[in-house]
């Protein structure tokens, strides 16, 4: 941003006009300049945004506050501004670098030359599962999806014919616990973009004999070879119908209808994004063949336990977290290894500036905090214990309150937050009882057990959040007001800041008068500038009828005879020792 500072030598006028402010929901900007004025000579331009006035940020100022702040600068005016050209530029939109969703459309089959890749003999790769069947349609299309449940035929071939066996197909490993998939595919990432750089190639499969291949896996591979052979080559094989399950023996009933259309409808169900760890049909068949279908229940339980102890913030990758790779997700069916996705998901989705683990901050300092595993979205962390609260505000009429700690055993109240019975020590605030761990700020979620809080609009906020978002600013000291607020002259004031100029006492809610823009209490104003009635010794206020006689000023109703109290307004009167008398008592009364 192109920020610059200007210093205009006083006195006013400064040669510019302002527009905007917090009350107009727009930043303070320069609306017009006077030709040859001080602002114009300092190279200030129309449209420049005012960032600070005399060292005080103008971001939260209203239009009137900014005007008063500029008026208060008599000697010199220092401002920090931002050029209009830099302020008008929109910030670049951050594009999420996630994996785009796959567009399902038919792809014609081509057969280019395939480069051979040598592989070591100790690789435990097996063919990916695919349905049984035969060719039935003259025109077939393929739906390439390397990470889907139905792996393409060219990606599941043996190591002698696959150019990229690791990236194109999901390898299967045979271990002591059975057949499982090595890559943990996330449920939301089952659809990955097709590899358009390498067209699908259907190569007739050759039987692969390894030391770890079981008889069931060989039968599955044999069925896959039968399904991949036909008059016309296709990638995902012919359409399939129902699968009858009888003691792990499967009978496939092929159909000879519109295979291309029905294949597109049925097969897309397997690689559509799912929630949780739902298995596709091919994986369920494979799990029953290898005898690992019962391992899924224990895996789901472990995954749920791992996920229940963590609450990652569901924010996009543009907030600072790197996009998840294919290995970060729920464990694939048939695997006996514990999934690491539940342990890594919180770190992968953690936004910038968030803390890792937040311990219960309602505990006293130097006390061991139990491990909870809750993820805090707040930038402030209480560490191992609650930090010592700020000192009590100096305002006597402060709005900040503190909760009262009640030990356990006296009574069992109901918590105002969760409406549950409290067993153990609790807090009392605003006439209600709270669990210590649930008495938190409504904004930052920090505990308020040992710090002050303020009630605002039915919610409870800590001192810091209330000062930041709700507390008004004093018109004299420019500080936040946490106590009693005085509203006068279209501004807010501390009680100790809105005082009489003459006596220095707080005016509070009493009557005051302005003289040359300065407030005076009623007593000092009339003593310095007002007129006192000679008769009642009360001030003659604006609008009162008065008259002047005997060198003094009187209310029209106070200028009466000192003996009979008859009004002497407009009548002949006499005076003895500066006391007015009527004709009747002028010669009969001696003072």
UniProtKB/Swiss-Prot annotation:
It comes from the Eukaryota. The keyword Zinc applies. Residues 2-85 form the PDZ domain. Residues 144-166, 310-339 have a biased composition (Low complexity). Keywords: Acetylation, Cell projection, Cytoplasm, Isopeptide bond, LIM domain, Metal-binding, Phosphoprotein, Repeat, Synapse, Ubl conjugation, Zinc. Residues 413-472, 472-531, 531-591 form the LIM zinc-binding domain. Residues 121-166, 186-398 are annotated as: Disordered. The modification Phosphoserine is found at residues 2, 111, 134, 137, 228, 260, 313, 322, 359, 361. GO terms for cellular component: cell projection; cytosol; postsynaptic density; presynapse; Z disc. The modification N6-acetyllysine is found at residues 89, 350. Residues 258-273, 294-304 have a biased composition (Basic and acidic residues). One of its GO terms (biological process) is regulation of dendritic spine morphogenesis. It is found in: Postsynaptic density; Presynapse; Postsynapse; Cytoplasm, Cytosol. Interacts with various PKC isoforms through the LIM domains. Interacts with actin and alpha-actinin through the PDZ domain. Interacts (via LIM domains) with SIPA1L1/SPAR; this interaction may occur preferentially with isoform 1. This is PDZ and LIM domain protein 5. It comes from Mus musculus.
């Amino acid at each position: 941003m192109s920020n610059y500072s200007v210093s205009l030598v006083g006195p006013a006028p400064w040669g510019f006009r302002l527009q905007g402010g917090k009350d107009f929901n727009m930043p303070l900007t320069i609306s017009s300049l006077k030709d040859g004025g001080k602002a114009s000579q300092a190279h200030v331009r129309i449209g420049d945004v005012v960032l600070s006035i005399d060292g005080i940020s103008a971001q939260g100022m209203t239009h009137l506050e900014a005007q008063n702040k500029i008026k208060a600068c008599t000697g010199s005016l220092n401002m920090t501004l931002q050029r209009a050209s830099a302020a008008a530029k929109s910030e670049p939109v951050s594009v999420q670098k996630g994996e785009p969703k796959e567009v399902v459309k038919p792809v014609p089959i081509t057969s280019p030359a395939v480069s051979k890749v040598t592989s070591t003999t100790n690789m435990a790769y097996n063919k990916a599962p695919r349905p049984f069947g035969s060719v039935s349609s003259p025109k077939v299309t393929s739906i390439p999806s390397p990470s889907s449940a139905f792996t393409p035929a060219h990606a599941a071939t043996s190591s002698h014919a696959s150019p990229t066996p690791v990236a194109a197909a999901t390898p299967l490993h045979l271990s002591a616990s059975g057949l499982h998939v090595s890559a943990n595919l996330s449920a939301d990432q089952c659809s990955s973009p097709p590899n358009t750089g390498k067209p699908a190639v259907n190569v007739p499969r050759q039987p692969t004999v390894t030391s770890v291949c079981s008889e069931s896996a060989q039968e599955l591979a044999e069925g896959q070879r039968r399904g991949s052979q036909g008059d016309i080559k296709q990638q995902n094989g012919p359409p399939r119908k129902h699968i009858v399950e009888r003691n792990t023996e499967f009978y496939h009933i092929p159909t000879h209808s519109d295979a291309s259309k029905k294949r597109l409808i049925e097969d897309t169900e397997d690689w559509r994004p799912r929630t949780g760890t739902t298995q596709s049909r091919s994986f369920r068949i494979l799990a029953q063949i290898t005898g690992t279908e019962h391992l899924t229940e224990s895996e789901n339980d472990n995954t749920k336990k791992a996920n229940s102890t963590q609450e990652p913030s569901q924010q996009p990758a543009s907030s600072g977290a790197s996009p998840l790779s294919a290995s970060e997700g729920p464990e694939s069916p048939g695997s006996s290894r514990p999934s690491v996705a539940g342990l890594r998901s919180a770190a992968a989705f953690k936004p910038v500036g968030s803390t890792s683990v937040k311990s219960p901050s309602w505990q006293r300092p130097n006390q061991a905090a139990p491990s909870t595993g809750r993820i805090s979205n707040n930038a402030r962390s209480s560490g191992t214990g609650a930090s010592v609260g700020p000192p009590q505000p100096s305002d006597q009429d402060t709005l900040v309150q503190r909760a009262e700690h009640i030990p356990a055993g006296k009574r069992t109240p109901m918590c105002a937050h969760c409406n549950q019975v409290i067993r153990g020590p609790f807090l009392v605030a605003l006439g209600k009882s709270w669990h210590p761990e649930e008495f938190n700020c409504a904004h930052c979620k920090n505990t308020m057990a040992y710090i002050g809080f303020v009630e605002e609009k039915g919610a409870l906020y800590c001192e810091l959040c209330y000062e930041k978002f709700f507390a008004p600013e004093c018109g004299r000291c420019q500080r936040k007001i946490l106590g009693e607020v005085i509203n006068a002259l279209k501004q807010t004031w501390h009680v100790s800041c809105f005082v009489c100029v003459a006596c220095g006492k707080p005016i509070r809610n009493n009557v005051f008068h302005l003289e040359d823009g300065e407030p005076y209490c009623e007593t000092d104003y009339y003593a310095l500038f007002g007129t006192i009635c000679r008769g009642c010794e009360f001030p003659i206020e604006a609008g009162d009828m008065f008259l002047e006689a005997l060198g003094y000023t009187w209310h029209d109703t106070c200028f009466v005879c000192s003996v009979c109290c008859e009004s002497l307004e407009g009548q002949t009167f006499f005076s003895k020792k500066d006391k007015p008398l009527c004709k009747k008592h002028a010669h009969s009364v001696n003072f």
